[in-house]
């Protein structure tokens, strides 16, 4: 039974790290090359390691809720994590709301959601992220907005800063 279970698990995709190949901002989808090879048996009983085909039309997940969304640029080469839905997402993706899956596939490479941001060690954020504040920052930390636990707000930019408001601005 354990052998049968392991055989079934080989066909079950859950999550894989990847690299953005291209991004379509209007559709909010990406093409992703996974960065872990797939193991397949060769005809002689050996094992080959092959690239998983590029995953296309994968929805990008931007953190959002309550009418607000955090967005950021996405470019080729950005590292990501692709999480595969346990059921076909096509009906939901096209129409929103509760849908009957148009296909009975499960854990398919066709049903991946992309979280941009997980990083391998060579591409980790340096300098390291703050351990005491929330930051919106550039990777090189040359520009940032920081909110601290002491309720302070700090902003830094080597360039110009502008604020446009239809009401009062207090600094």
Label every PLM stretch briefly:
Residues 164-171:
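Short, intrinsically disordered, charge-balanced linker/junction segments flanking boundaries
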